[in-house]
Amino acid sequence: MAVPKKRTSASMKKIRNHSWKIKSVEKSLKSFSLAQSVLSGRSKSFYYGTEKKPFQKN
């Protein structure tokens, strides 16, 4: 199994962690914005039924 030859520096570790955190924040903001548009009824990219049908037993 391959093993790295040198230890990762602290600065490189911070850079990688920072980019990972930024990506997660961007995704969470995007999903929150999408949820807001769906709940407010202004969404143009989703089609969903607005009438509620009662549960029917067969």
UniProtKB/Swiss-Prot annotation:
- Top-level division of the source organism's lineage: Eukaryota
Q: Does the keyword Protein biosynthesis apply?
A: no
Q: InterPro entries given for it?
A: Ribosomal_bL32, Ribosomal_bL32_plant/cyanobact
Pfam families reported for this sequence: Ribosomal_L32p (PF01783)
Give the molecular function GO annotations.
structural constituent of ribosome
Keywords of this entry:
Chloroplast, Plastid, Ribonucleoprotein, Ribosomal protein
Q: Where in or outside the cell? A: Plastid, Chloroplast
Main localization category = plastid
CC per GO annotation: chloroplast; large ribosomal subunit
Biological process terms from the Gene Ontology for this record are: translation
The keyword Repressor appears for this protein:
no
Q: Which family does it belong to?
A: Belongs to the bacterial ribosomal protein bL32 family.
Protein name per its UniProtKB record: Large ribosomal subunit protein bL32c
